[in-house]
Amino acid sequence: MNYINTETQQLQTEAEIRALNPNTSYPVPFPVPEGYAYVFPTAQPVYNPVTQTVQQTTPELTVLDTWEQRWEVVEIYQNQQDKDDAIAASLIPIRAARNAAIRAERDRRKFNGVLVSAKWIHTDTYSRTQWMGMVMMGASVPAIEWTTMDGTSITTSQALAGAVFQATATLDATLFAYAKSLIAAVDASSDPASVDITTGWPATFEGA
């Protein structure tokens, strides 16, 4: 809590007032001493912590005859180039984090299945190798009841293997193109944290 000396306009805390009056015994709770007034707190103004700071100024006596805390926003940099450099430096870790999140989502979806013949087919590395093997087998693909991502099954065939291969290749290309566009948007934005990186992705399996 802050108090203002109504004569000198000096702002002081309880501890500072006690220290200035070592021979005075104050009760608990601490009363407003004579010659002082309680300063009601107010919210700090909005400011950019990269280029600005905020500091208390002399409290103001309101029309209600109460004192209120006042703030002042102060520019850190007087030179525009220094300010621009500080802003640019502050955006580097933000862009890096956003781009890492984009790549992580791209890779998650890459291994999160493709929809073929109304079935979600696994696209993890092992499954991709198996389907590639079936494509290479051509007409010799055995008819197997293949378990899909939702627990149901589908019968393997040459046509299915080709369709899965095509769908997987399309997914990969679409994911990489979309991730690249998002990264470009993040890198170009003066407010990279505001770029929406969660929507617009190609659909993958989201659970039964």
Residue ranges and their predicted role:
Residues M1-A208:
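A preference for well-ordered globular domain cores
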